[in-house]
Each structure stands twice: as structure tokens, then as C-alpha cells.
A protein has these predicted regions:
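Domain-scale recognition of soluble eukaryotic interaction modules
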Residues: 1-13, 20, 74-184
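N-terminal onset of structured domains
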Residues: 3, 17, 21-59
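Acidic/polar N-terminal loop/beta-strand segments that form early-domain functional surfaces
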Residues: 48-50, 65-67, 80-82
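A generic structural motif
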Residues: 51-53, 66-68, 106-111
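Proline-anchored loop/turn motifs at beta-strand termini and strand-loop-strand connectors
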Residues: 65-75
Length: 184
């Protein structure tokens, strides 16, 4: 039997999903769908890389996982497409999988916030890396690179976009030593 909070979450999530499909964020190049028609708690999302950015021409896939007490608790959002970005975790480990996102709306989630509020912030994130809120390793490697060698950072970001997010990307070809198999 479902508890009240899960039933409420299902209603809220279903309504948000319907709203986003009735009035999609096409001006931002964002679409949402379901991985499985029987599970409203897991969405797939696509974001087109904005023009004149490191991510231009890319098609980025994300997964949105809603908790049973949504909207009282924040959803989990992860990039499934590898992306070289200051505010997206790219290091793969058992406890911190690829693609976790650092954005203010998620970090400062308030009861009643919505995915519709977060999606434009994700699009804005592709316009500009935020060095004040990096999702980085303990040595701040990417942040230092972004600040001290922006040309190299840009090359890496464009490489990742071309390699993993272009329409012709071969998603099974990753740089040596990288294992993204759990995202398939």
C-alpha cells in the first residue's frame, strides 16, 4: 500500500510532467520524457548545447529521479552524457557516480520548488561555468584549470561535447581507463 506522501508525490510529478509536455521549454532546447511509462519517478531529459558555448551542437541526456516525498525533498539529477563542466562531477566512483550536478536551486531546495524551475538553471549552466560552485576533486583541478588555463579547459569541454554529445557520438568509445558502463 502506498503512503500519503508517495501518492502526493505521484500527483505533483504527474502534473509537472503534463505541464512540461503541454508547454515544453523548446526555447531552451529542453525536453522531458519517461524511461518507463509505468514509473513517473524517473524522467529522461535532453538539453541541446547552447550556441556559441563549449557545448554547442551537443545533445546531453540527463536522468531525473524523484524522491517519494517530492516536492518536499529535491530530485536527483545526473548527466548521463559525459560532459566536461566545472559544475558537473565527472569522476566515477562507487559512491559518487558520474554526472551529479551542482546548482543553487538543488543545493538550496525549498519545499514546493519544481523541476520546471531547475531546468532553465541547467540550461544557464551550459552557458557559463560557475567557479564559485565547482563540483571538483579535493585538489580543485578543474577549477584551477578553468581559472589558470581557460584555453585548455575550453578544448577539453569541446572535445567531450564532440566525442560524447554530438549526433554522431559513439557512446561506447570512452578514453582509456574510464568506465561508464553503469549508465548504459
Amino acid at each position: 500500500m502506498l503512503d500519503k506522501s508517495k501518492i502526493n508525490a505521484m500527483k505533483v510529478i504527474s502534473e509537472e510532467f503534463k505541464q512540461l509536455n503541454r508547454a515544453p521549454l523548446v526555447n531552451l532546447g529542453i525536453t522531458v520524457g519517461l524511461f518507463n511509462e509505468d514509473n513517473i519517478f524517473e524522467w529522461k531529459c535532453t538539453i541541446l548545447g547552447p550556441k556559441d558555448t563549449f557545448y554547442s551542437g551537443g545533445l546531453f541526456y540527463l536522468k531525473i529521479i524523484f524522491p517519494n516525498d517530492y516536492p518536499h525533498s529535491k530530485p536527483e539529477m545526473v548527466f548521463l552524457t559525459p560532459i566536461y563542466h566545472l559544475n558537473v562531477k565527472y569522476f566515477v566512483s562507487q559512491h559518487q557516480p558520474l554526472g551529479h550536478i551542482c546548482v543553487n536551486t538543488l543545493n538550496e531546495w525549498k519545499d514546493g520548488d519544481s523541476v520546471k524551475k531547475i531546468l532553465p538553471e541547467l540550461f544557464a549552466l551550459l552557458h557559463k561555468n560557475n567557479p564559485l560552485s565547482p563540483y571538483d576533486d579535493t585538489n580543485n583541478t578543474r577549477r584551477k584549470e578553468f581559472e589558470n588555463n581557460p584555453t585548455l579547459f575550453a578544448k577539453k569541454a569541446k572535445y567531450f561535447t564532440k566525442k560524447f554529445a554530438s549526433p554522431y557520438a559513439k557512446l561506447k568509445e570512452y578514453p582509456n581507463g574510464w568506465d561508464f558502463s553503469y549508465n548504459e
